[in-house]
Amino acid sequence: MRLATAAPLPAPAWAARVIWYQIFPERFRNGDPSNDPTRDSLEDPANVPQNWRITPWTGDWYSRDAWETAQDKPGSPDKVPNFYKNGVLDRRYGGDLQGVLEKLDYLHDLGVNAIYFNPIFYARSLHKYDSSNLQHIDPYMGPDPKGDLELIANEDENPATWHWTSADRLFLKLVAAAHRKGFHVLIDGVFNHTGRDFFAFRDLKAKQQASHYKDWYVVNSWAKPSDPASKFTYKGWWGHDTLPVFAANADNTDLAAGPKQYVLDVTKRWLRPVVDGKPAQGIDGWRLDAADERPAKFWTEWNAYVRSLKPDAYTCGETWKPAARFVADDGFSACMNYFAFAFPVKGFLIDARIPASRFVMLLDSRRKAFSPSVVPVLQNLVDSHDTDRLASMIVNRRLAAYPPDGDISYDENNDVRNNNTYDIRKPDAGDRAIQRIVVLFQMTYLGAPVVYYGDEAGMWGAHDPDCRMPMVWKDLKFDPQATDPRGIGRSPDDLNFDAHLFAFYKSAIAFRKAHAVLADGPVEFLNPNDSNRTLAMLRRGDSEEIVLAINRGDQPRVIHLSSPHLEWTDPQIAISTDGSRHTLARDSDGWDINLPPLTAAVCQGMIPVLPRNHGPP
């Protein structure tokens, strides 16, 4: 297929008005125990004990089942490698599509209106970034795994061989149900690498240079029957041999022809599905894993193809680097906004290790590097499946090692496996106060907020795999979290659903949705005070102005609100992180608000209907 490379279309308008909710499917909700994964479905079942079983959803996370401890080697010097190497990655909890269907009302009640799914395609790992194919939803997320596996056994890259499995159909049912409730749906596209069980790689490994797929992967050396010493070796993503990398074309400007056509066919299948001869509702866009590791030409053509299929589709590239040029050159709608949002938030609001003025400078300079049309649709996340959870970042805020050059410490050794001093405890009241500040800032800043599943329910956890614990639910009673992977004593923690934190998330989300200025209005920071760790942020619309005041310090502070563009009348406190109705006092050139330590409040006021100077973007 020859693709045109047109100028990228503007990002869809809907993407500026959503609050994303990220779901890690295997850990969200087990709605159908009859389809639970089996030992044979695991990545390397021969190395998993016969007494393997589904892990109880509500158990103590660091407590290990008998099949896990059976793998421990006698005389191991410590217990940390045993927990992380022997068992936890082979755990399955049974999260599935039926579970998501059952909890759409929960998400609707929370107020989020867009769902981003981590990979849901057929794969053997728990995370599913090691796809076995991309044309099918994982059979163990649907109602008939055995039947689905039989149906797809002889498929190849030709779409004419592809069926619609029961899991595929259930996913499309979920998409339609989500659309009826006002959600947009984004799925993870892993087009950089596959798993070793991927149909093309299995054929390549078996047939070597005689394989039809010999040009699909980066092969370093072939196994030759005439040379018993020869070995089949290939490039794995970041050295992981479980994730063989798709090859580029000869001049490294594009994806190789074979995998490229396959990716295009998969893209069309899920954006514009036709089932039993009838069009069905498809997804609303893609999040692209490791997007900055593929040539720009491929993404430019792929993004143009996506828009030709669905003009209002949203595409979001994963990158942790400065991303403005990447988004513009490759044609994406946006990116996961680690560099321009999560990093500064970690530095000031969470760790309090950079001054307020630098926080403002980083946010302003990194935001303004993007096209103004891109900024409102950036995915403003703080944590994800690839980091420790927000709550645990806060618990461990004093551990962050900030280098002399002033760079921000983000996702570095944030787990027990690599940092023996990492604290796995439940957040306390002070930690939750900081979490509420972060959330209120996220919900009032420019860009689309992202909530990682369970953060709103009180979940905490270190870096992968500890950030991927089973979701806590109101109707489930969790065991006390009483085990420490280091084999030391621990005070039991209550992991059950946090209704108070949920209520705060819900109110902050509702406030954002109720005020259009928060989705597209300009941003102006007011009076950052480095010694007090205070600042304010002004968002201006045609009829109202909203100011967020933040005291990140450990003392009560009066925060002065003044700007040539602040023209409101009769401002009121709309929402605060401590639930108090703080008062605003007028002075000669603005307003004062007195905030306790670790508190933020949103002030809202109407403005005169007069010609106005809108100020900076």
Regions found by a protein language model. Give the residues of each.
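Loop/helix patches that line or flank the sugar-binding groove of alpha-linked glycan CAZymes
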Residues: 15, 30-85, 360-568
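Conserved, mostly hydrophobic/aromatic
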Residues: 23, 107, 117, 134, ...
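Aromatic- and acidic-residue-enriched segments that line the glycan-binding/catalytic groove
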Residues: 16, 32-54, 123-143, 191-236, ...
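C-terminal beta-strand-rich structural cap/linker in extracellular carbohydrate-active enzymes
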Residues: 19, 585-617
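Solvent-exposed beta-hairpin/edge-strand motifs
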Residues: 563-579
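Active-site-proximal helices and loops of the catalytic beta/alpha 8
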Residues: 175-183, 192-193, 201-208, 266, ...
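N-terminal structural segment of carbohydrate-active enzymes
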Residues: 1-183, 261, 268, 598
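Short, solvent-exposed turn/loop segments enriched in Gly/Ser/Thr/Pro and often Arg
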Residues: 24-27, 115-127, 189-198, 289-294, ...
